[in-house]
Amino acid sequence: MPIGVPKVPYRIPGDEEATWVDLYNVMYRERTLFLGQEIRCEVTNHITGLMVYLSIEDGISDIFLFINSPGGWLISGMAIFDTMQTVTPDIYTICLGIAASMASFILLGGEPTKRIAFPHARIMLHQPASAYYRARTPEFLLEVEELHKVREMITRVYALRTGKPFWVVSEDMERDVFMSADEAKAYGLVDIVGDEMLDEHCDTDPVWFPEMFKDW
């Protein structure tokens, strides 16, 4: 079995024949991004850079962000969220597997009506945690104060984008809250459960494929 990133045939516009290129390069050309690991600085720079480039290249066509992540660094996740709100194209967020912690925050950041969870996906939200709990007391107190500010900011974003009262979101974030796709839709984290989208199109068009795959 081959090791590494799979290669697939892809015909670059203007070329007569297809060439073998990395799968991810093909997906990037189709404006499809993947967040499939813990959210760290390197991953954040990679995804935000692609979003900015794709926005410059085409400021109209949608971007698709697939998410299967356990979460990660607070500031890195906020950087992705802010970039999503800044670029001009609408961004679909699609959860497959799990979107936990900051990954659920990014899932929430997709364009309203374009946030999707696959039927067996799991979404989890909880309050931010500090990495400096072993610091000396003065440093720890400063960290707690800053963390409290960030927690309030994130809670307000959840409340605004889900339509839930601030106090409801704040209480829910006191613990790890896992949700199914249907529960996440009822909560307001996503707009569509994947099987609903498939059922809608399959009833009217048995050979339907997502728009982004039609030219393949």
UniProtKB/Swiss-Prot annotation:
- A Pfam entry, by short name: CLP_protease
Query: PROSITE patterns, from UniProt?
Result: CLP_PROTEASE_HIS (PS00382), CLP_PROTEASE_SER (PS00381)
Per UniProt, subcellular location reads as: Plastid, Chloroplast stroma
List UniProt keywords, sorted A-Z: Chloroplast, Hydrolase, Plastid, Protease, Serine protease
Which reactions does this protein catalyse? Hydrolysis of proteins to small peptides in the presence of ATP and magnesium. alpha-casein is the usual test substrate. In the absence of ATP, only oligopeptides shorter than five residues are hydrolyzed (such as succinyl-Leu-Tyr-|-NHMec, and Leu-Tyr-Leu-|-Tyr-Trp, in which cleavage of the -Tyr-|-Leu- and -Tyr-|-Trp bonds also occurs)
Q: What is its main location?
A: plastid
Active site, renumbered: 101 (nucleophile), 126
Show the GO cellular component annotation of the record.
chloroplast stroma; endopeptidase Clp complex; plastid
Annotated protein name in UniProt: ATP-dependent Clp protease proteolytic subunit
